[in-house]
């Protein structure tokens, strides 16, 4: 006794302070929301929802006390009676018993390890006593109920209720509560999904204890044991149309806060609405499906190896794999569990099976064991997509191989209004809106023509649309026809390649490369060749949207952003975006009059030229430009109103021909129209602001001091093929093909770090072309 007293006197003062339990801050996941508060993403290894003790039902509290600590309400942290009983049982060779109280488990979970030593047990007992002196019994229970690990990545009983039963903890029945109460002792051993028999034995033990403690009646125990329990896999209800945006926000949060981003319970509100996201996703998917119609079957998405799996366990293995898959547009992921010459049996999540005969397999009817498909041939273990038809039967389908992106931003602030980075985020998280570096073709020409206006050209400058050869390179118009002397306005309206090259030649490549960087492109993205006039730079759809925003907002460079506000776990505002705003804090990169003239020309493109299909929207405030690259590998349309800029792109991840005649105006523009029809619905037609210093004369728009072309420009209007030229007749509204040229390359754009001296809420002037956060 004397030694124990000395040990206590020596050890007790050295015990750690109880800040962790007094000021409990549980690990809570990062949650990302749309602008209106719909969950679009949840990240964190620990599934936990902090819940106050009064929100846990009495039936659960009683079940846990009956399971873990019968005398919880009476002891001082250590159950002396339980310790003596366990010691006698262990010494007599009986079943090994533990005697750790709930308070001791709290002490262990917060401060100690699980090592089985007398020193640890001694410290645990002293800590339990210290905790009992500091906190009330309900406070201790609250810590335990929120911190304890209960399997399936669930921490705390509120999370476990969701994970195992997909219900709120307050709604648990006695049977469900006693199943969960059995988990703390050994979450894996008593997992009701994996080990239902052991879980039931543990449940029966707890129910018997509850009867013994007069918490329930024998009849209630019997009813609970007879209750048929349904275990339902829980998934956070995340909007499936906003996953690319959520991932962008997650990456930015990780850059700012590191691993703490996933444990501090941050609540992040983004700039996108679920309605816009749905419209954007629908527009992109319907376009890509239409382009993929009639394409040959590409084969299984994946092959699972069942060679070491017993036949009776194949369905369980398939179920385990499918637990992390998602149905997209009615295309259900399935695993082939039987395959022969007559057909297949496809296993779907939840135990559903579909038997498909060869004739039912649609596009995949020749895919069983097909050597031409290699390892993508259908066999046992193949992961495929099936779809239910109107008559109730199933068939094999596939996701489009062709990909695309849509990004829509606020022209005045850069706030992302909608963003879709591909057909299916679950299949491939690569975000084509921000990461895919592709040639924009003629969609890049507006930047070239803006440079021309700055250099001394006007919208009415006459340039020869005629064959031209420069050091062995002969760019051509896609239809092989030439119109002779036409204005810059006409040239851009009908996307004339030879005119674009001539004006680039007159400006000089060095000047042109430097000028287009004003729109946000970097030098390494722009090849040092005249071919940049035809769009051989390597750019992302997001960069194109930001670039066109300069025209839309009157000459200011805004920067895109998706995070609007960040709150902590207690709903305190932690940070708020301070965007660069056109006309206020955003840097002016081109003359507002230049932007106005370019918008005037691009309005013609969108209403009379290659983008004339936009007339279907019945609006007078639209401007934009189509784009197509060589061999029809990429198709674009970027268009805008004074308030919204939307860029769309279509192409294969590994560039190849989309198909003959796949012009931007033919396949990309319809996607743009479908989205903008929704985005602009109910919004009044707005006018582009006419800046001071603009003159309108003879139906054309000029800068006041430049109403004629600079006579010193070295513009070459000669041609060695005059016979090829015909007077301008409005050609078909289609995009010009990009001739062979140098390819530029660039890596993913670097996300600028948020400056430590973030601007105040007053949004003072800033010369940096980057948004910043105001942090409280």
Can you annotate each of these PLM segments?
Residues 89-116, 170, 237-241, 412, ...:
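Conserved catalytic neighborhood of penicillin-recognizing serine enzymes
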Residues 270, 274-277, 281-286, 312-317, ...:
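A penicillin-recognizing enzyme superfamily signal
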Residues 49-54, 366-375, 399-404, 427-447, ...:
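Short active-site loop at a secondary-structure junction
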Residues 64, 210, 280, 341, ...:
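Active-site SXXK
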Residues 474-477, 508-546, 555, 562:
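Mid-domain, small-residue-enriched loop/turn segments at the edges of structured enzyme/sensor domains
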Residues 1-33, 71, 91:
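N-terminal type II signal-anchor transmembrane helix
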Residues 73-82, 155-158, 217-221, 430, ...:
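Short, well-structured active-site flanking segments
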Residues 4-5, 93-349, 517-518, 522-523, ...:
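Non-catalytic, structured segments within soluble enzyme domains
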């Amino acid at each position: 006794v004397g030694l124990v007293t000395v040990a206590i006197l020596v050890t007790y003062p050295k015990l750690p302070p109880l800040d962790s339990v007094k000021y409990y801050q549980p690990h809570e996941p990062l949650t990302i929301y749309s602008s209106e508060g719909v969950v679009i993403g949840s990240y964190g290894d620990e599934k936990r929802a902090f819940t106050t003790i009064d929100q846990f039902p009495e039936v659960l509290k009683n079940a846990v006390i009956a399971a873990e600590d019968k005398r919880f309400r009476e002891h001082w942290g250590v159950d002396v009676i339980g310790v003596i009983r366990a010691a006698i049982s262990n010494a007599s060779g009986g079943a090994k018993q533990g005697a750790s109280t709930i308070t001791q488990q709290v002490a262990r979970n917060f401060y100690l390890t699980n090592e089985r030593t007398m020193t640890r047990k001694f410290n645990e007992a002293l800590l339990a006593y210290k905790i009992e002196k500091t906190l009330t019994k309900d406070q201790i229970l609250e810590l335990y109920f929120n911190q304890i690990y209960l399997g399936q990545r669930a921490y705390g009983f509120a999370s476990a209720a969701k994970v195992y039963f997909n219900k709120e903890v307050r709604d648990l029945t006695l049977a469900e509560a006693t199943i969960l109460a059995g988990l703390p002792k050994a979450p894996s051993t008593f997992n009701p999904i994996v080990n239902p028999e052991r879980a039931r034995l543990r449940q029966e033990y707890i129910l018997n204890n509850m009867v013994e403690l007069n918490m329930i009646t024998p009849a209630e125990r019997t009813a609970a044991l007879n209750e048929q329990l349904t275990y339902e896999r829980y998934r956070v209800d995340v909007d499936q149309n906003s996953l690319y945006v959520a991932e962008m926000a997650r990456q930015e949060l990780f850059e700012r806060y590191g691993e703490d981003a996933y444990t501090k319970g941050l609540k992040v509100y983004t700039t996108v609405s679920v309605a816009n996201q749905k419209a954007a996703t629908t527009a992109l998917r319907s376009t890509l499906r239409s382009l993929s119609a009639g394409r040959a079957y590409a084969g299984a998405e994946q092959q699972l190896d069942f060679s070491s799996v017993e036949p009776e366990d194949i369905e369980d293995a398939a179920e385990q794999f499918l637990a992390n898959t998602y149905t997209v547009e009615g295309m259900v992921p399935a695993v082939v569990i039987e395959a022969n010459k007559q057909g297949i049996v496809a296993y779907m999540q939840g135990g559903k099976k579909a038997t498909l005969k060869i004739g039912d397999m649609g596009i995949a009817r020749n895919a069983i064991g097909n050597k031409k498909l290699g390892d993508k041939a259908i066999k046992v273990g193949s992961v495929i997509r099936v779809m239910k038809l109107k008559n109730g039967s199933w068939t094999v389908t596939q996701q489009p191989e062709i990909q695309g992106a849509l990004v829509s931003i606020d022209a005045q602030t850069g706030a992302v209004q909608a963003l879709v980075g591909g057909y299916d985020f679950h299949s491939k998280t690569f975000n084509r809106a921000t990461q895919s570096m592709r040639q924009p073709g003629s969609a890049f020409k507006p930047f070239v023509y803006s440079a021309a206006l700055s250099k001394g050209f006007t919208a009415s400058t006459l340039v020869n649309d005629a064959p031209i050869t420069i050091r062995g390179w002969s760019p051509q118009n896609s239809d092989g026809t030439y119109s002779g002397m036409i204005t810059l306005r006409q040239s851009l309206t009908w996307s004339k390649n030879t005119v674009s090259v001539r004006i680039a030649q007159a400006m000089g490549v060095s000047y042109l490369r430097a000028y287009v960087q004003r729109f946000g492109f970097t030098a390494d993205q722009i090849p040092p060749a005249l071919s940049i006039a035809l769009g051989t730079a390597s750019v992302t759809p997001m960069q194109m949207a930001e670039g066109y925003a300069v025209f839309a907002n009157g000459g200011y460079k805004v920067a895109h952003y998706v995070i609007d506000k960040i709150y902590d776990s207690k709903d305190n505002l932690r940070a708020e975006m301070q965007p660069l705003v056109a006309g206020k804090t955003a840097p002016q990169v081109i003359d507002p009059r230049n932007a106005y003239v370019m918008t005037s020309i691009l309005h013609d493109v969108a209403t009379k030229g290659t983008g004339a299909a936009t007339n279907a929207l019945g609006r007078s405030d639209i401007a934009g430009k189509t784009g197509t690259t060589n061999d029809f590998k990429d198709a674009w349309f970027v268009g805008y109103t004074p308030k919204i800029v939307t860029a769309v792109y279509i192409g294969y991840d590994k560039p190849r021909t989309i198909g003959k005649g796949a012009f931007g105006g033919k396949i990309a523009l319809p996607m743009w129209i479908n989205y903008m029809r929704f985005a602009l619905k109910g919004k009044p037609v707005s006018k582009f602001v006419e800046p001071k210093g603009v003159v309108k004369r003879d139906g054309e728009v000029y800068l006041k001091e430049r109403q004629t072309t600079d006579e010193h420009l070295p513009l070459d209007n000669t041609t060695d093929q005059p016979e090829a030229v015909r007077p301008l007749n409005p050609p078909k509204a289609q995009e010009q093909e990009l001739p062979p040229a140098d390819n530029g390359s660039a890596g993913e754009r670097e996300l600028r770090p948020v400056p430590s001296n973030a601007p105040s809420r007053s949004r003072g002037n800033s010369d940096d072309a980057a948004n910043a956060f105001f942090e409280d």
